[in-house]
């Protein structure tokens, strides 16, 4: 155990360039790649992240995917939902796909989605 502590202490004194050189030397010596080690380490993290969405989502983002044929109606509805001015609402609609409202409850997101779809827009909830 004392040897490991000494190694850790010695490694802690290396500069970034020396550490990079050490990594290259170890890759050559052991016939491995640091990139492969990173990919292996990232695997379990992705699995843990996939388990997280099993919980109920509480905040939603309403995204305007497309404005469809009724652009003016969609602009009016975006103004009503967001409180934006005419130019800002028009710019948002024309830049679709674009978030209209972020961090809203599920009920509010569904209400906004229904209103925008009624105006002719294609809407996604994220």
UniProtKB/Swiss-Prot annotation:
One of its GO terms (molecular function) is mRNA binding. Keywords: Ribonucleoprotein, Ribosomal protein. Gene3D superfamilies: 3.30.1390.10, Single helix bin. The keyword Ribonucleoprotein applies. Disulfide bonds: none annotated. Pfam families: Ribosomal_L12 (PF00542), Ribosomal_L12_N (PF16320). The keyword Phosphoprotein does not apply. Belongs to the bacterial ribosomal protein bL12 family. Homodimer. Part of the ribosomal stalk of the 50S ribosomal subunit. Forms a multimeric L10(L12)X complex, where L10 forms an elongated spine to which 2 to 4 L12 dimers bind in a sequential fashion. Binds GTP-bound translation factors. This is Large ribosomal subunit protein bL12. It comes from Methylocella silvestris (strain DSM 15510 / CIP 108128 / LMG 27833 / NCIMB 13906 / BL2).
């Amino acid at each position: 155990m004392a040897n490991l502590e000494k190694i850790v202490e010695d490694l802690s004194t290396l500069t970034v360039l020396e550490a990079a050189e050490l990594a290259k030397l170890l890759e050559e010596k052991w016939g491995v790649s640091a990139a492969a080690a990173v990919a292996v380490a990232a695997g379990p993290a992705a699995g843990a992240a996939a388990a997280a969405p099993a919980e109920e989502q509480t905040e939603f983002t309403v995204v305007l995917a497309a404005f469809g044929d009724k652009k003016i109606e969609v602009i009016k509805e975006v103004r009503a939902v967001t409180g934006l001015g005419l130019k800002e609402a028009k710019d948002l609609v024309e830049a679709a796909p674009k978030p209209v409202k972020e961090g809203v409850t599920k009920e509010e997101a569904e209400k906004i989605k229904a209103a925008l779809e009624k105006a002719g827009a294609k809407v996604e909830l994220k």
